[in-house]
Amino acid sequence: MTQTIFMVGARGAGKTTVGSALALALGYQFIDTDLFMQQTTQMSVAEMVEQEGWLGFRRRESIALQTVTQPSTVVATGGGAILAEENRRFMRQHGKVIYLRSPAEVLAQRLEEYPQDTQRPTLTGRPIAEEMLEVLAAREALYQEAAHYVMDGTGGPQQVVEQILSALQLETVK
């Protein structure tokens, strides 16, 4: 299998952590679309949003997603990449989409434990626990629609990687 693997899920779901470990296990390249955009623009996500608004940021995110997609690559997407129907369709057509699903309280706890990883500005202006509840409620159906596989993201990174590898292996056997 050399298909691109796309990691989707909310902020704090572990897309970057699990995605990089998965890439290592598969011998794939790993790319995080947020980091790619930061490197190519020399701006943080917050600066991009401040300068271009969320609409401009999302447009840039769609271009980045298509730019980094290549065989034998694991791509960690931004939490909102699935908001654009074009992105959901693109990912499903060009690879396998893995949704790392975790409850809002787990996501909030992770984001509070690792505040440096929360480089995105708040979406709602509310406390992180409330924001995660609201974001998941709004996006859950879109994550599900995009996903080929829905994985429990509450375990440790290696445990989640093993679950993903098992799911992908079962598919190649069919």
Swiss-Prot record:
Belongs to the shikimate kinase family. AroL subfamily. GO terms for biological process: amino acid biosynthetic process; aromatic amino acid family biosynthetic process; chorismate biosynthetic process. Binds 1 Mg(2+) ion per subunit. Signal peptide: none annotated. Its main location: cytoplasm. It comes from the Bacteria. Catalyzes the specific phosphorylation of the 3-hydroxyl group of shikimic acid using ATP as a cosubstrate. Pathway: Metabolic intermediate biosynthesis; chorismate biosynthesis; chorismate from D-erythrose 4-phosphate and phosphoenolpyruvate: step 5/7. This is Shikimate kinase 2. Keywords: Amino-acid biosynthesis, Aromatic amino acid biosynthesis, ATP-binding, Cytoplasm, Kinase, Magnesium, Metal-binding, Nucleotide-binding, Transferase. Substrate binds at D34, R58, G79, R139. Its cofactor is Mg(2+). The keyword Kinase applies. Its EC number is 2.7.1.71. ATP binds at G12, A13, G14, K15, T16, T17, R120. It catalyses: shikimate + ATP = 3-phosphoshikimate + ADP + H(+). One of its GO terms (molecular function) is shikimate kinase activity. CDD domains: SK. The lineage of its organism: Bacteria, Pseudomonadati, Pseudomonadota, Gammaproteobacteria, Enterobacterales. Monomer.
